[in-house]
Each structure stands twice: as structure tokens, then as C-alpha cells.
A protein has these predicted regions:
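Hydrophobic transmembrane alpha-helices of multi-pass small-molecule transporters
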Residues: 1-51, 211-297
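Small-residue-enriched core segments of transmembrane alpha-helices in multipass membrane transport
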Residues: 80-85, 179-184, 263-271, 329-335
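Membrane-core helix-loop-helix motifs of multi-pass transport proteins
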Residues: 128-236, 368-387
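Membrane-embedded alpha-helical segments and adjacent helix-loop junctions characteristic
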Residues: 33-130, 280-364
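Transmembrane helix-loop junctions in multi-pass membrane proteins
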Residues: 17-37, 69-73, 156-171, 247-260, ...
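Hydrophobic core segments of alpha-helical transmembrane domains in multi-pass membrane transport
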Residues: 5-20, 55-66, 150-151, 158-162, ...
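Hydrophobic alpha-helical transmembrane segments
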Residues: 6, 102, 146, 176-177, ...
Length: 387
């Protein structure tokens, strides 16, 4: 990310500088470097204003997610996933801590709980390495878990919905159908590709490989509180849930416009009702979750400032227009507008960088959150994860 950030800034600087050298002054018109300077200051200010605008929406969604988490929704999802995971990872014992960590990681990602998913993912890789006969070389299970994690099975892209709401989208939750379709497709492709590659290039273990388990570092321990997740539901329950999720795609496509206005109110009523049924003190828990939303919105300010300033430098220097003109005909032929290309390139590399680019694109008056490009970049952010 350091190299990418520097390349973006230097490209904008030298592109604007080149135009400045050959600039023909126009009375009352700014020079290229003046335009660049103004864009930098305005984008830095705009990044802070955007983060402040996100506070309320992030507080709402993280408050609701906290109620769902306290009520045990994470455990329910983990129990649904477990029978499928046991079959996808035959090399990992069903009762091994690695299996539990992977299940909890995927369940947290489904709910958009990135902060909870990250430590589970790290713990999963640590535990998988203990089963690794050749440390330093990824096993088939490690590769498959990384592929599934990167494809990001997501049911509720709360962060993207919050950003779209802050950008003034007419229907912030309208990306749920496209996100669901994309995440199912990407996960299916990830599993098939990983399994095929395992067959085409089987893992070989050196005879002299160290087969000792990696030592456990007590400082890296991640609390695994969901003991109930160790007992999964029957396989038919998991398959029924998977079928229902796939069936939501055509329903969302054909009836999405009618259903989407109900999504956010239904989420609030549903999660609060779920919390009441599970005897959660919904008000207190909601407030605690909302505090997390405030902290998240404030914490992303430095990332937004860095990325929005860099992207606006590209735009103000004229480099972005040149890139759009050069690549628009190529990428546009398969449905990827050149304006969305920076997002497609950044998403696998940096979550915070992609979030900043998404904010820049959907807050651009020429694009907006309700355009095709706005929907596309929102779906890219909501349905994939960094590698």
C-alpha cells in the first residue's frame, strides 16, 4: 500500500507539473498546479466531513449488529456452516481449534463484523499451521481458506450501506441483491478453483520437513467464546439454508425494487425482536454497539484523508481523465467503466484504500451512488475482501 500510495501521488504531481510547464495562462483561470493544490485541500476537508456524516449510520448498524451478536446469531450461523466446512476441509479434524476458528471467521464475515472476523482468521491460520507438516509452505486447507475468505461470503454489507446512505443514495440497501449474487458466485468459483488446483498440483512434502507442531504463543491467543458452535446442525439444515440463500437471488432480481425499501426497517425490527426473544437487554447493548460505530467512523478519518487526497490529485491533475480515455473502450466492453477501474485494482490490496476510493467515486457529482458505476463499486466493496 505504501508503494501504491506514493505512485498515485507522484503520478498526479508529475502529470500536473508537465502541464504546468507548457501551460498558457488564461486571464482569471487557474494554473494546473493551482488546481492540484486546491483539490488537495478540499479533499482533505471533505474526508473529515464524510467521516462525520458516517457516524450516525455506522452507530445505527453496529448497534443492531451488537444486539444480534449478543443474542447468539453468530453461533447460529456458525452451526449452519459447520457441516459444510467439515466436508470442504477433510484434512482438518472436525474438533480441531482450526475448524472452530474458520467457522467463526466466516460467520462473522457474513454479518459484516469485520472487527470480529479478523482475529478469528488470524487464529485459524495459526491453528492450521500446527497441522502443517512443512512450515513455510501453505497447505491445501490454508489455500482454500484464504480463497473462501477473500471471496467474502457476505449477507449484510453494513459498511457499504452506511457509506451509500451518507452519500445520499435513494436506496442505500439496494446493493443487497447484487452483493448476494456476487458473493455466492465468487465463493463458488473460489472453492472450485482451489479444489481443481489441488488435483492439478498436489502438495508434496519434503522427507526432511519439520513435522513438529508450531509453538503456541500465549500472547496471540484469541478468545473462542462460542462453545455451542462446536455442535453443528444436521447437514440437511445447512443445505436447506444454502438453498434458501441461493433462492433469494431471483427473488431479489424480480422483486428487488418493491422489497428494498423494507430492508433497513425490517433489519432493525428483526434484530431487536431477535434480541428480545433471546433475552438481550437490547437498549443497553444497542448503545454499546453504537459507541463502536462512533469509534470506527473516527478511526477511518486518516485513511480517508490519505486516499481521497491521492485520488483527487489524480483527478485534478488530469491523469484520471487520460486513463479513462485510454482504458474506457477496453474495460467498458465487458461492463467495467474506466471510472471503476481504480476500485477494482485496489480492492484486493487494501480494504481501507478501497473504502476511500469507493467514497470518492460515489460522492463524485458526475457519478453518484445511484448510477451503474455507483452500484458496481459498491458491490465490489461489499462482496469481496482483501487478500
Amino acid at each position: 500500500m505504501n508503494i501504491i500510495f506514493v505512485i498515485i501521488v507522484l503520478s498526479a504531481f508529475f502529470f500536473a507539473g508537465w502541464h504546468q510547464i507548457f501551460f498558457i495562462p488564461v486571464k482569471g483561470g487557474p494554473s494546473p498546479m493551482e488546481v492540484l493544490s486546491k483539490a488537495m485541500i478540499e479533499s482533505a476537508t471533505g474526508a473529515v466531513e464524510l467521516a462525520i456524516g458516517l457516524v450516525g449510520v455506522m452507530a445505527l448498524f453496529l448497534g443492531l449488529m451488537k444486539v444480534a451478536e449478543a443474542g447468539g446469531l453468530l453461533t447460529i450461523l456458525a452451526r449452519l456452516i459447520r457441516p459444510l466446512m467439515v466436508r470442504l476441509f477433510p484434512d482438518v479434524p472436525a474438533d480441531h481449534p482450526a475448524m472452530g476458528a474458520m467457522i467463526l471467521n466466516l460467520a462473522a464475515n457474513m454479518l459484516g463484523l469485520g472487527n470480529a472476523a479478523t482475529p478469528f482468521g488470524i487464529r485459524a491460520m495459526q491453528e492450521l499451521d500446527k497441522l502443517n507438516p512443512q512450515h513455510g509452505t501453505a497447505t491445501n486447507s490454508m489455500a482454500l481458506f484464504l480463497a473462501i475468505n477473500t471471496s467474502s461470503v457476505t449477507l449484510l454489507p453494513t459498511g457499504v450501506i452506511a457509506l451509500r446512505a451518507a452519500a445520499g443514495a435513494s436506496d442505500p440497501a439496494a446493493i443487497l441483491p447484487t452483493t448476494l449474487f456476487a458473493t455466492i458466485g465468487s465463493t463458488t468459483v473460489a472453492v472450485i478453483a482451489a479444489k481443481l488446483y489441488q488435483r492439478l498440483s498436489p502438495l508434496t512434502v519434503d522427507d526432511g520437513a519439520d513435522i513438529q507442531q508450531a509453538p503456541s504463543n500465549s500472547n496471540d491467543e484469541v478468545k473462542m467464546p462460542l462453545k455451542d458452535a462446536a455442535q453443528g446442525y444436521p447437514l440437511w439444515v445447512s443445505l436447506a439454508a444454502l438453498t434458501a440463500m441461493v433462492a433469494l437471488i431471483p427473488v431479489a432480481v424480480f422483486y428487488g425494487r418493491s422489497v428494498s425499501p423494507w430492508i433497513i426497517p425490517s433489519l432493525m425490527v428483526g434484530f431487536l425482536g431477535f434480541g428480545l426473544v433471546r433475552r438481550v437487554r437490547v437498549y443497553e447493548v444497542f448503545v454499546e454497539g453504537a459507541k463502536d460505530g462512533f469509534r470506527v467512523a473516527i478511526r477511518i478519518i486518516p485513511y480517508l484523508v490519505a486516499i481521497l487526497v491521492a485520488v483527487d490529485m489524480l483527478r485534478a491533475s488530469g491523469f484520471m481523465d487520460s486513463m479513462v480515455g485510454a482504458l474506457g473502450g477496453i474495460t467498458g466492453s465487458f461492463g467495467l467503466p474506466a471510472e471503476a477501474l481504480p476500485m477494482a485494482l485496489m480492492r484486493p490490496l487494501s480494504g481501507s484504500g478501497a473504502y476511500g476510493i469507493l467514497a470518492s467515486i460515489i460522492n463524485d457529482p458526475a457519478i453518484g451512488p445511484d448510477s451503474y458505476t455507483g452500484y458496481l463499486v459498491s458491490t465490489l466493496q461489499g462482496s469481496t475482501e482483501t487478500t
